[in-house]
Amino acid sequence: MIKFIMLFIISFLPPAIYAIWIRNTEKYEREPWQAIFIAFLWGATIAIIASLILEILLSIPIYSSFKDYSVASFVIAVIIAPFVEELTKPLALSLRGVKKEINEVEDGLVYGAIASLGFSATENLFYAMGFLSYGLLLFFILVAILSLIHI
């Protein structure tokens, strides 16, 4: 249980720090913390679940179309997964608690980035489960750097 708590903190801390930084970059009308939390939570939970379901459904015909398992896995990892993930993350902008707060152009950018960071945090946790043998320091460095690619 202690390992999971450590992995959770290491996985979520860099994206949370980036989210705070992005929220605070607005000069005039900063977004409310509640809406920021909703967008982050969307990315960390619902977008992940929706992505997993869609990726599984779309991978079935891909695996049956290719005789080579490695080619099918490559197509899913390089084409299907990014497309599905980038489709589910911005849906946070349509949430009631977020949508009412969008009144400037950059608001959409802020909430989109925050939802992406939430997605990144959960994805980091998934990867962390497999990285235990490599050491927590290496994993923390990867999380700190790779969280930004989701924005």
Describe each PLM feature range.
Residues 1-149:
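Hydrophobic alpha-helical segments at protein termini of multi-pass membrane proteins
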